[in-house]
Design a protein with these regions (language model features):
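Short, mixed-charge low-complexity intrinsically disordered segments
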Residues: 35-67
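Short, flexible N-terminal segments of the mature chain
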Residues: 13-44
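A short, compositionally biased
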Residues: 1-4, 36
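A short beta-strand micro-motif
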Residues: 3-12
């Protein structure tokens, strides 16, 4: 499975952060043994703190909302 999207649940701010990784970011992420280490390199770019988030990575993004 190729990771194209990262979804973060920031429990300190109550935000859901959806990131579509660029081709360059996907390539860079593959050079890390641990995907979480890669995520720490993009914290400042996307303005989140990994220690305050739960995350998942997916190839395809699907959403449902019951609001």
């Amino acid at each position: 499975m190729e990771t194209n999207y990262v979804i973060l649940l920031d429990y300190s701010s109550g935000e859901i952060i959806k990131i579509r990784l660029s081709d360059e970011e996907i390539q860079k992420s593959e050079s890390y043994e641990d995907f979480e280490m890669f995520l720490s390199t993009i914290e400042s770019k996307y303005n989140f703190r990994l220690k305050d988030c739960y995350w998942m990575s997916v190839e395809y993004l699907k959403e449902r909302s019951y609001i």
